[in-house]
Amino acid sequence: PPKHADNRRVFAYLRSRGVDAEIINHCIKHGQLYEDAERHNCVFVGYRNDKPAYGALRGTLSDSTFAGEAPGSDKRFSFAVPRCAGGKTLCVFEAAIDALSYLTLLKLRGQDWRAANTLSLSGIYQPRKDGSIRSPVALEQYLKDNPGVARIVLCLDNDGPGRAASAAIQKRLSEYEVIDNPPRRGKDYNDHLQMVKGISGRVKTRGGEAR
């Protein structure tokens, strides 16, 4: 979507959800986050060969529950921080805001958030009846593009679909060291961050994240 002249609503929304200002500004500076001109949604941008290839949308109004994708998005190239990945460990989340929340938690603990590699799957697939699951295309592509990854930390949601997806991915990627690391409190890492910071009034999302 076209960019708004500024990112004030996006910045204010993410700050209200507990995300650290430095991390928000980092994503804006590197072209990974902006405010869309028409609806003022957060747009979390994923890249392919330094060109935008994916956009996850999230409403910023106080009563908004919207989550979706920009038309023409290629989910293989989902939102990841940093854009230029490195290192052997990858932390995987269902949503972009959970990845940013995790980085904020690292900073609160005095750890170097810039050293972490995070990937949003932009939703998960529901497991099949036999318990198997389609491998998330964003994760498959990331591992293909970054063969140095040896350890995968699954930071998926603390609910039925998230737990089932985590178990299925662990089984599917047995050649890697896979660690299950759901949030200690709340449904997801943004929930956990808000609890740590004492923020209340979380709004659940609905809409176009793939399942």
Model regions and ranges:
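Short glycine-/small-residue-rich flexible loop motifs, especially phosphate/cofactor-binding loops
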Residues: 11, 99, 170
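Basic, glycine-enriched DNA-binding surface that flanks or lies within the catalytic cores of DNA
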Residues: 1-84
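Helix N-cap/beta->alpha junction signal
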Residues: 48, 94-97, 158
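Terminal peptide-recognition signature
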Residues: 14, 44, 94, 102, ...
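Conserved phosphate-coordination/catalytic loops
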Residues: 70-71, 93, 133-134
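TOPRIM fold recognition
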Residues: 88, 104-211
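A short, charged/proline- and glycine-enriched loop
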Residues: 84-90
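Acidic, divalent-metal-coordinating active-site segment for phosphoryl/phosphodiester hydrolysis
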Residues: 97-98, 165
